[in-house]
Amino acid sequence: MEPFSSKSLALQAEKKLLSKMAGRSVAHLFIDETSSAVLDELYRVSKEYTHSRPQAQRVIKDLIKVAVKVAVLHRSGCFGPSELALAARFRQKLQQGAMTALSFGEVDFTFEAAVLAGLLTECRDMLLELVEHHLTPKSHNRIRHVFDHFSDPGLLTALYGPDFTQHLGKICDGLRKMLDEGKL
């Protein structure tokens, strides 16, 4: 027989409730204005690249669900010492990816899709390892979906191409602000 834990039960209920409500209103509870603006631009890029509104909505919804669930796990103190160390390494890798994306956006002729895709793949693998024992396989698939979508070399090449200059500029502005404020 499993021991009863009201904290565990409350956490399960919170995650279940949040998974049903991962829309704009809930996102604003966990995601600030700058992050929201970056997510909106990522949605526009995905929509233009895939020519599919539902596909773009799905990837951003999955991203929000994952971000909210990881935030809930972190705030609830569910991560042990080794997981917190992994979370710190994940954050550093994410920051490295953001700085690389900024560098590619600011310095002409430096963009390499393989470098950015590699960083995103490393982030995906670290996040999957971090939440392995805390989230369901469905959430693991969401993580794969989000990172695989944004690490697609075709999408990255399009993002750094002439047709997406405006979107890239807004994404870079948001990433720079998030890095400066320590929110990434």
From Swiss-Prot:
Protein purpose: Acts as a negative regulator of innate and adaptive immunity by maintaining immune homeostasis. Plays a regulatory role in the Toll-like signaling pathway by determining the strength of LPS-induced signaling and gene expression. Inhibits TCR-mediated T-cell activation and negatively regulate T-cell function to prevent hyperresponsiveness. Also inhibits autolysosome formation via negatively modulating MTOR activation by interacting with RAC1 and promoting the disassociation of the RAC1-MTOR complex.
InterPro entries the UniProt entry points to: TNFAIP8-like (IPR008477), TNFAIP8_sf (IPR038355)
Organism: Rhinolophus ferrumequinum (Greater horseshoe bat)
Pfam families on file: DUF758 (PF05527)
Record protein name field: Tumor necrosis factor alpha-induced protein 8-like protein 2
Record comment regarding domains: The central region was initially thought to constitute a DED (death effector) domain. However, 3D-structure data reveal a previously uncharacterized fold that is different from the predicted fold of a DED (death effector) domain. It consists of a large, hydrophobic central cavity that is poised for cofactor binding.
Subcellular location, record wording: Cytoplasm; Nucleus; Lysosome
PTM remark: Ubiquitinated in a BTRC-depdent manner; leading to degradation mediated through the proteasome pathway.
Family label: Belongs to the TNFAIP8 family. TNFAIP8L2 subfamily.
Domain of life: Eukaryota
SS bond list: none
GO cellular component terms attached to this protein's record: lysosome; nucleus
Keyword terms: Cytoplasm, Immunity, Innate immunity, Lysosome, Nucleus, Ubl conjugation
Quaternary state and interactors: May interact with CASP8; however, such result is unclear since could not reproduce the interaction with CASP8. Interacts with RAC1.
GO process terms (BP): innate immune response; negative regulation of inflammatory response; negative regulation of T cell activation; regulation of apoptotic process
